[in-house]
Amino acid sequence: VEKFGQQGRGDVAHLQPPVGTPAYRQCRYWMHYAEGSLMNWLVMKLVFVTIPKRPMPFFVRPIARGLCEKVQATLIDPNLQAALAFIEGHLGTHRWFAGPEITMADFQMSFAVEAALARGTQESQYPHLQAYRERLVKRPAYQRAIKLGGPVIMA
């Protein structure tokens, strides 16, 4: 999507703000933030929640569980909460991530937002994040995608 947007091709050119504008810089920032920062914490959370549930010798399980809980409590959870608070703050003053209209950044961030909210994040703690998600899922394009591909399942 980004490559086609940069080349001004197809139906995606309107999803990238004009180069050199503040909205363009925000779009680039949030596109990279999604994969380079937020998803790292979400994937680490998934891994460290999953490890103790995997088959292992009974005497290793308490060690693995304790280690995973400690890593989550001291590293993953504080950083994930800080990232979500940062996003919450941005969405408190912006309808979309990069400008007045939806952009590529919103598509990039949408999965991370869905994943964060599906992983037991207290929705009441992040009302702007929840409102953003609701705006996304109400879009006709989102509804068409769900109709074609099925619902988003965060298993």
How should these model regions be labeled?
Residues 73-90:
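Amphipathic alpha-helical packing segments from all-alpha helical-bundle domains
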Residues 70-77, 96, 119-122:
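Active-site rim elements
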Residues 17-25, 75, 93-105:
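All-alpha amphipathic helical-bundle segments outside canonical DNA-binding/catalytic cores
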Residues 1-66, 70:
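GST-like domain detector, emphasizing the conserved glutathione-binding G-site
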Residues 12-18, 40-42, 96-100, 125, ...:
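Short, hydrophobic secondary-structure boundary micro-motifs
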Residues 122-155:
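Long hydrophobic alpha-helical segments typical of transmembrane helices together
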Residues 42, 97-122, 130, 136:
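GST superfamily/GST-like fold recognition
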